[in-house]
C-alpha cells in the first residue's frame, strides 16, 4: 500500500515480505525514492497499482498524489513530504499477475475490475496523459487474453476507448530445467540444457503471434501495445543464498537467450511496445550483480549494450536462408537468428546470434543498395557457461570484431559458436 512508503523514513510502517524472502520490508524505497531513481537514470516511469488487495480510492489517491499540480488533499500531502512539483507518470499498470499472486482471479472478474479501477486513473496533466496497462496473460494462456479483451471491449464503452487500455501486459519466463520444481542452475548445465533454454526462449515468438492475433480481432489498428514486462531466464538460486531473493549467476547461455528474445521483439515491434527483462540487479536474469560496494556487469548487460542502437530506429525486413536446424529433443532450433534496423542518420544495425554451442558458420549479408560503406562490429562470445565473477569481472565482455570483409555490396564473416555479433553499417 503506497501510503506506507511516504513521509519520514523512520515513521514508515515495517512489514514482513511474505512473497520474497520472509524478511522485514521497511518501506524505505517508496514513491519519492522511485521517482528520484528514475530522474537520475533519465528513464520513463512505469508505476503499478494494487488491485489484488487495494481499493479504487487508494489507487485514485496515489495517481492524484503523483501527478496533480493544484490544491487537493493528496497534492498537499506530496508537498508536505518535500516535493512541490508533480511528477510525470508515463505508464500505469492496473494490477499485476491477477491470474495468480495478484488475486487468483478469473479473467472476466479481472476485466470488470480493470474497467472500474482504470476509470479513476485520472489524466491530471493534459500534456502528459498516462498510458494505462491492463493485466494480461501468463505465457500461453490465450483464454485470459480473450476473456479480458471481451470484457473490456463490451458495451457500454466509447467507440474510441479501445478497451480502456493503451497496453496489455504479458509475462513469460524461460525455465531451462524440467519444471518449476527443477529449474536447473545458471552455471552448471549440459549441452542439452543449453538448447533447452534457447528452444524455450524462441517460444516467445509463438506467444507474441498467439496473443497478437487475439488483439488484432479487437484492435486491428494496433493502438494497444503488447507489454512484455516480465521475461528472462529463471534458474535455481545460487547455493547458500536466500531462496526468496532469486539471486542467480549469468552466463553466455543467458546472453544468447537475451539476444534471441530481443531479436524477436524487434521483429514484432508493430505490436510489442515495451519489454522489461526481470530484473535489473541481483534478481533473476540481471544485467548487474553486486556484492557490498563491488559490482560487475553480466553477459546479459553486454547484449543490451550491443542492442541499444535498435532503440528508436526503424525495423528493416531481413531474412536468413540456408540456415541449419539444430534438433535437440522436442526443440528445433535455427542455428542463426537476426534482426536489422536503420537509424535516422541511415546507419544500419545488424544483430546476429549463433545459437550453436559448438559450430561456427560462414555468413554473407547482402545489402540491397550498393554504396560506399563503413562497417564496424562488436562480438560477445565464450564458452557456453562462461560468466563474470567479482574475482574475474571481465571474463565475458564485448570486444571488437575484425573479421568482416566486403565485396560488391556483400559483407562476409564467420560467426563463432555461442556468440552474438553487432554490425554497424554507415
Spans of features found by a protein language model:
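Aromatic-lined substrate-binding rim segments of carbohydrate-active enzymes
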Residues: 1-68, 110-129
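Conserved, mostly hydrophobic/aromatic
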Residues: 38, 62, 92, 168, ...
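Aromatic- and acidic-residue-enriched carbohydrate-binding clefts of CAZyme catalytic domains
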Residues: 1-31, 72-100, 176-193
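Aromatic/acidic polysaccharide-binding cleft in carbohydrate-active enzymes
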Residues: 172, 223-338
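Acidic, Ser/Thr/Pro-rich beta/coil linker or hinge segments at domain junctions
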Residues: 371-411
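Structural recognition of the beta-strand scaffold that forms the well-ordered cores
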Residues: 45-48, 90-94, 131-134, 166-170, ...
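Carbohydrate-binding surface patches
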Residues: 332-371, 377, 382, 421-422
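Noncatalytic carbohydrate-binding groove/subsite architecture in carbohydrate-active enzymes
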Residues: 107-259, 321-331
Amino acid at each position: 500500500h503506497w501510503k506506507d512508503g511516504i513521509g519520514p523514513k523512520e515513521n514508515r510502517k515495517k512489514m514482513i515480505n511474505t512473497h520474497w524472502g520472509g524478511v522485514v520490508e521497511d518501506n524505505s524505497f517508496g514513491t519519492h525514492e522511485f521517482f528520484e531513481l528514475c530522474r537520475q537514470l533519465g528513464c520513463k516511469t512505469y508505476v503499478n497499482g494494487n488491485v489484488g488487495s487495494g481499493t479504487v480510492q487508494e489507487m485514485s489517491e496515489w495517481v492524484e498524489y503523483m501527478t496533480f499540480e493544484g490544491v487537493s488533499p493528496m497534492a498537499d500531502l506530496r508537498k508536505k513530504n518535500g516535493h512541490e512539483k508533480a511528477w510525470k507518470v508515463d505508464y500505469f499498470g492496473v494490477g499485476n499477475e491477477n491470474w495468480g499472486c495478484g488475486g487468483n482471479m478469473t479473467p472476466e472478474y479481472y476485466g470488470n475490475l480493470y474497467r472500474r479501477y482504470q476509470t479513476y486513473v485520472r489524466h491530471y496533466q493534459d500534456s502528459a496523459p498516462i498510458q494505462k496497462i491492463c493485466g494480461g496473460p501468463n505465457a500461453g494462456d490465450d483464454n485470459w487474453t480473450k476473456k479480458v479483451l471481451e470484457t473490456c471491449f463490451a458495451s457500454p464503452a466509447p467507440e474510441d476507448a479501445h478497451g480502456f487500455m493503451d497496453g496489455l501486459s504479458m509475462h513469460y519466463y524461460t525455465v531451462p530445467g524440467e519444471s518449476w520444481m527443477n529449474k536447473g542452475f545458471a552455471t552448471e548445465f549440459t549441452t542439452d540444457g543449453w538448447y533447452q533454454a534457447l528452444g524455450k526462449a524462441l517460444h516467445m515468438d509463438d506467444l507474441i503471434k498467439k496473443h497478437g492475433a487475439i488483439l488484432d480481432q479487437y484492435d486491428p489498428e494496433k493502438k494497444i501495445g503488447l507489454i512484455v514486462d516480465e521475461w528472462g531466464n529463471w534458474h535455481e538460486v545460487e547455493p547458500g543464498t536466500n531462496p526468496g531473493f532469486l539471486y542467480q549467476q549469468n552466463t553466455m547461455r543467458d546472453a544468447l537467450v537475451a539476444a534471441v528474445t530481443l531479436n524477436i521483439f524487434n521483429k514484432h515491434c508493430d505490436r510489442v511496445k515495451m519489454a522489461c527483462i526481470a530484473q535489473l540487479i541481483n534478481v533473476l536474469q540481471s544485467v548487474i550483480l553486486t556484492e557490498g560496494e563491488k559490482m560487475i556487469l553480466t553477459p546479459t548487460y553486454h547484449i543490451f549494450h550491443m542492442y541499444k542502437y535498435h532503440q528508436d530506429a526503424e525495423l528493416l525486413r531481413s531474412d536468413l536462408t540456408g540456415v541449419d536446424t539444430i534438433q535437440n529433443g522436442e526443440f528445433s532450433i535455427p542455428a542463426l537468428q537476426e534482426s536489422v534496423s536503420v537509424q535516422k542518420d541511415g546507419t544500419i544495425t545488424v544483430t546476429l546470434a549463433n545459437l550453436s554451442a559448438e559450430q561456427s558458420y560462414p555468413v554473407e549479408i547482402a545489402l540491397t543498395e550498393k554504396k560506399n560503406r563503413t562497417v564496424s562490429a562488436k562480438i560477445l562470445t565464450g564458452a557456453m557457461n562462461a560468466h563474470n565473477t567479482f574475482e574475474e569481472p571481465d571474463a565475458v565482455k564485448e570486444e571488437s570484431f575484425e573479421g568482416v570483409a566486403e565485396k560488391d555490396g556483400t559483407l562476409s564473416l564467420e560467426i563463432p559458436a555461442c556468440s552474438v555479433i553487432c554490425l554497424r553499417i554507415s
